[in-house]
Amino acid sequence: MNQKSILKIAAAACDDKRAEDILALDMEGISLVADYFLICHGNSDKQVQAIAREIKDQADENGIQVKKMEGFDEARWVLVDLGDVVVHVFHKDERSYYNLEKLWGDAPLADLDFGMNQ
């Protein structure tokens, strides 16, 4: 499965759990870590965990290997490593503090091109 398909599956999982401000940064040629960063946030610890759990469940259902998941128990910043796609699920407060969008401001936004409830 290609990176764009993985990105869309992960974004749809975020949307299914009503994640807010879902966006993807095209990191190809900018970061050695991943080709895409998918960033979103939830408004509570429970929502952050639900989003991360849904990403993992959808990855499993689609045969996508979850290489690592960090921060789930704390639910402030959960990182889900799907290989060339790394998903950052923040608690709302942490997202504004770390501001990855600004940190990686030279990365263009990737088109997610499907209906989302943002």
Curated annotation (Swiss-Prot):
Record keywords: Cytoplasm, Repressor, Translation regulation
Any one Pfam family match given in the protein's UniProt record, by short name: RsfS
Cellular localization per UniProt: Cytoplasm
Molecular function via GO: ribosomal large subunit binding
UniProt keyword Repressor, yes or no: yes
Biological process, per Gene Ontology: cytosolic ribosome assembly; negative regulation of ribosome biogenesis; negative regulation of translation
Function according to Swiss-Prot or TrEMBL: Functions as a ribosomal silencing factor. Interacts with ribosomal protein uL14 (rplN), blocking formation of intersubunit bridge B8. Prevents association of the 30S and 50S ribosomal subunits and the formation of functional ribosomes, thus repressing translation.
Family membership noted in the UniProt record: Belongs to the Iojap/RsfS family.
Annotated NCBIfam families: rsfS_iojap_ybeB
Quaternary structure and interacting proteins, as annotated: Interacts with ribosomal protein uL14 (rplN).
Protein name: Ribosomal silencing factor RsfS
Provenance organism: Bacillus subtilis (strain 168)
UniProt gene name: rsfS
